[in-house]
UniProtKB/Swiss-Prot annotation:
Induction: By light and circadian rhythms. This is Clock-controlled pheromone ccg-4. The gene is ccg-4. GO terms for biological process: response to pheromone. It comes from the Eukaryota.
Length: 299
């Protein structure tokens, strides 16, 4: 298959217009503090990128017509798209993975499907740029909120009936119907387990998912330790306290804390950076876990 950032995701990112938020810098700074959600997301993104880069080149044998290998490639592409959405430059991160250099090229059948999907996405994108169209209104209202993987409107659009990307998940009814691979090559028929061999696509998909799961679990454990560390004060890392408000001789301690905690409150609001990053982590975890479940009997 051809590795390109899913077109539906690309259109959403391209059409989204950033909306200025009060105290946005303080909120973002809080979210990046060691142990906070944005720090965890960055750690997972780095771990995934390192895992992909360490996989070597193309598989040592032809995978064309082999269904498990094709599914494994789609799984990695799906996980890469989700993680890329959490980055400031979505396309730069996705392109830096160079997935096309790690997995076998598309079969002719996949290329045909990709061309049709691209034409449909481009046609929709052109139509939705016209001021006043229903999709234009929807994008204008939801651009900032709905482009984040895991938001409520993203979940609505990700239903099997509404979102073709859902069909990439192994086992879905639409996956079985649309993505059923052509008849396997004789070599694959004779040895259906070869996709699990070191360097093949199934092995690579499992290793990428393991890297994500390990990074999430490690980050969560480290964050939990920080919460129990009485010497760690994230408030001090956001900015200096206001001496007029936080003079301990004139004001109770909790007044200073409430003032300093405002970036934390904003970050953990329903539309805050910490909340969004937490949803992103859940999305990454769920997809990685699905990949590991699909390859649970592999070495």
């Amino acid at each position: 298959m051809k590795f390109t950032l899913p077109l539906v995701i690309f259109a959403a990112v391209a059409s989204a217009t950033p909306v200025a938020q009060p105290n946005a810098e303080a909120e973002a700074q809080w979210c990046r503090i060691h142990g906070q959600s944005c720090w965890k997301v960055k750690r997972v993104a780095d771990a995934f990128a390192n895992a992909i880069q360490g996989m070597g080149g193309l598989p040592p044998r032809d995978e064309s017509g082999h269904q498990p290998a094709q599914v494994a490639k789609r799984q990695v592409d799906e996980l890469a798209g989700i993680i890329a959405l959490t980055q400031e430059d979505v396309n730069a991160y996705y392109d830096s993975l160079s997935l096309q250099e790690k997995f076998a090229p598309s079969t002719e059948e996949e290329k045909k499907t990709e061309k049709v999907a691209k034409r449909e996405a481009e046609a929709e994108a052109q139509w939705c740029r016209i001021h006043g169209q229903s999709c234009w209104k929807k994008r204008e209202a939801e651009a900032q909120w709905c482009r984040i993987h895991g938001q409520s409107c993203w979940k609505r659009d990700a239903l099997p009936e509404a979102e073709p990307q859902w069909c990439r998940i192994h086992g879905q009814s639409c996956w079985k119907k649309r993505d059923a691979a052509p008849e396997a090559a004789p070599e694959a028929e004779a040895n259906p387990q070869w996709c699990r061999i070191h360097g093949q696509s199934c092995w690579k998909a499992k290793r990428a998912a393991e890297a994500v799961m390990t990074a999430i679990q490690s980050a969560e454990a480290e964050s939990a330790l920080l919460l129990r560390d009485t010497t760690f004060s994230p408030v001090d890392r956001v900015g200096k306290r206001d001496p007029q408000v936080c003079n301990m001789r004139l004001h109770p301690k909790k007044v200073c804390w409430k003032r300093d905690a405002s970036p934390e409150a904003a970050c953990n609001a329903p539309d805050g950076s910490c909340t969004k990053a937490t949803r992103d982590l859940h999305a990454m975890y769920n997809v990685a876990r699905a990949i590991l479940t699909a390859h649970s009997d592999e070495n």
